[in-house]
């Protein structure tokens, strides 16, 4: 696997772990019990901090998907669809790429 793939997978793992732990923190702090105003204020702050961390994690996941889309569009990665070793025909990805290349060649000829 390439370094880029490993980095993207690590980012996904870190972001999902962060989302899970922060959501757990929010749920745990939402337990109903009689609390004074200072305890409620502290819990409110912790919930706001946890939601901010969740938003950052989601933005990181969006960055990963955007990077994958850009790499695919620029031809840096090939889609793996229906692998032969999995019992599939393995032709679908190649057919899709051929159609995309034919379409882009036709557009290039029309604009030239």
UniProtKB/Swiss-Prot annotation:
GO terms of molecular function: transcription coregulator activity
Record function comment: Component of the Mediator complex, a coactivator involved in the regulated transcription of nearly all RNA polymerase II-dependent genes. Mediator functions as a bridge to convey information from gene-specific regulatory proteins to the basal RNA polymerase II transcription machinery. Mediator is recruited to promoters by direct interactions with regulatory proteins and serves as a scaffold for the assembly of a functional preinitiation complex with RNA polymerase II and the general transcription factors.
Family according to the record: Belongs to the Mediator complex subunit 22 family.
Biological process, per Gene Ontology: regulation of transcription by RNA polymerase II
Disordered: region residues: 83-112
Subcellular location: Nucleus
Gene: SRB6
PANTHER family: MEDIATOR OF RNA POLYMERASE II TRANSCRIPTION SUBUNIT 22
Protein name (Swiss-Prot/TrEMBL): Mediator of RNA polymerase II transcription subunit 22
A Pfam match: Med22
Assembly information from the UniProt record: Component of the Mediator complex.
GO cellular component terms, semicolon-separated: mediator complex
Compositional bias of kind Basic and acidic residues: 96-112
Main location: nucleus
InterPro entries assigned to the protein according to its UniProt record, in alphabetical order: Med22
Organism for this UniProt entry: Yarrowia lipolytica (strain CLIB 122 / E 150) (Yeast)
UniProt keyword terms in alphabetical order: Activator, Nucleus, Transcription, Transcription regulation
